[in-house]
């Protein structure tokens, strides 16, 4: 039951990232690379195959999804990406050797997607807005209000995801102590708190 809840939550969180050119593909690429590395560390070719195929697909897709995007994943593509990442993570977790801190390392790989989902839910709850209605209040929208460019938003979230994926992978590989997994989690929580201070439900500033 916990696995099902986790897969559904992560799938939906990644689907919500499709709000700006290149963001879902960038974050998904980084996350898939982390999962592929974790599966490869255990020498499990079968578990490494789904993230490997998704990684290749996302890299190719990103070439056409970078700003200005010529194609977009849409609901089907974003949900599929999230489902493959979530289910691959669940499979790697289930097959991980006991000495691996997989229970904390693997969820860290989805830090950016989960942070965005948390930001949206908290923001809409505080503003008494429908939780399931898109209101332009994601991380991408708030960064744009800070005048970060569209490609810049994808780069920022890619670096954020990269830091989380690197930490989670090193913890899984037993290079870092499991406590280090709290670093990206704590940092992401602080980022969410800071992003909540950026107005999301007012008209954006007019630029020339």
Give the role of each language-model region.
Residues 3, 7-8, 25-208:
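Alpha-helical transmembrane segments
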Residues 16-24:
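RNA/tRNA-interacting regions in translation and RNA-turnover enzymes
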Residues 8-15:
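Active-site alpha-helical segments that house and flank conserved acidic catalytic motifs
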């Amino acid at each position: 039951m916990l696995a099902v809840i986790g897969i559904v939550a992560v799938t939906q969180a990644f689907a919500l990232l499709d709000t700006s050119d290149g963001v879902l593909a960038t974050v998904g690429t980084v996350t898939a690379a982390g999962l592929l590395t974790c599966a490869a560390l255990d020498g499990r070719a079968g578990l490494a195959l789904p993230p490997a195929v998704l990684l290749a697909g996302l890299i190719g897709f990103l070439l056409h999804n970078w700003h200005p995007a010529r194609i977009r994943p849409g609901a089907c593509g974003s949900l599929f990406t999230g489902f493959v990442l979530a289910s691959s993570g669940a499979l790697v977790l289930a097959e991980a050797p006991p000495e691996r801190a997989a229970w904390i390392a693997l969820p860290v790989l989805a830090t950016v997607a989960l942070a965005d989902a948390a930001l949206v839910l908290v923001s809409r709850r505080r503003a008494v807005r429908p939780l399931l209605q898109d209101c332009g209040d994601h991380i991408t929208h708030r960064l744009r209000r800070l005048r970060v460019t569209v490609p810049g938003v994808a780069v920022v979230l890619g670096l954020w995801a990269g830091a989380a994926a690197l930490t989670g992978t090193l913890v899984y590989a037993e290079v870092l102590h499991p406590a280090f997994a709290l670093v990206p989690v704590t940092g992401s929580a602080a980022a969410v708190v800071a992003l909540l201070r950026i107005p999301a439900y007012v008209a954006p500033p007019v630029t020339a």
